[in-house]
Amino acid sequence: SAMAVCFLLWGFQPLYWFLCTNLCGQIDTFFLMACRIVWAAVCCLCILKVQGKLPRLWAVFRDKQVLKREIPASVLLFGDWMVYLWAVQNGRVLECSLGYYIQPLVVFALGALIFKEKMSWRHSVIIAIVVVGIVLSTSGFGGVPYVTIALALMFAVYAAIKKSLTIDSIVSTSAEILMMVPVALLFILFFRMGDDGMGGMTVLKQLLMIGGGVVTGLPMVFYAIGVRHLPLMTTGICQYISPSLGIVCGAIMGEALTREKLVSFLFIW
């Protein structure tokens, strides 16, 4: 399904950003984020052009009721991407994986609270066990796992907002990404036109930045399609694909899975 493809792509994404860093040297997180936004927007616009849906995209920006949900969704998506990129660049992929393991359970809770989806006593017990896992993770990660908590909360709320939207899924996601573009372009123009940004762009860097837009935009499109056609709780279950692959990526990238971290993961599994 579209949702499964989405989480497979997300699961292996850390390796792409790791590759970018290894081939191009340490890239400023903010500059990488700005390039990611711009090229993801280009990717989405191309998809909408092929599908003949560009008029629907422009209509979103004229609908105040839709914008009331799209703007918060865009802000949450921006925050999620920013935290994720920073974590990957700073060797905290396992913390990201822990956050993505917790997300489904936050989604379960939101599904029950907002959309009145039935949550059994088993789900309640599972959520309680996960809370214990989060508390234990403060030891394994050397303090409160802020990356874990931030990613879990932001994307879960984002999923709930997406579930409440009635407009075309791909159009919705494209609108959210497009809203970020002015901020990204202003940042590049004012702060990264020198050698630490655009001035230092080689052909390889440019190709990797374009690729970053594709690996960002495509999963979001698949997610937007899947979340509209699946119960929120089923979406939550599919989310376990990505963090499981994230642990594999963390191992490839040299992160140590200590005993304390393993105990935290076992509680959440």
Per-region residue spans from a language model:
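Helix-helix packing/entry segments at the starts of transmembrane helices
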Residues: C35, S97-I102, S169-M179, G217-A251
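C-terminal transmembrane-helix exit sites in multi-pass transporters
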Residues: W86, Q103-R122, S244-V263
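Membrane-interface interhelical linkers
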Residues: S1-V5, A41-P72, W121, T173, ...
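Hydrophobic transmembrane alpha-helices of multi-pass small-molecule transport proteins
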Residues: C44, R122-T138, L151, E260-W269
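Glycine-/small-residue-enriched transmembrane alpha-helix faces in small-molecule transporters
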Residues: S1-F31, V132-S164, V214
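Hydrophobic/aromatic residues within transmembrane alpha-helices
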Residues: C20, L32, R36, A87-V88, ...
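Membrane-interface helix termini and inter-helical loops of multi-pass transporters
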Residues: L15-T29, R56-A59, Q89-R92, I134-V135, ...
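Hydrophobic alpha-helical transmembrane segments of multi-pass membrane transport proteins
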Residues: A4-F12, Y16, I71-V88, A150-I161, ...
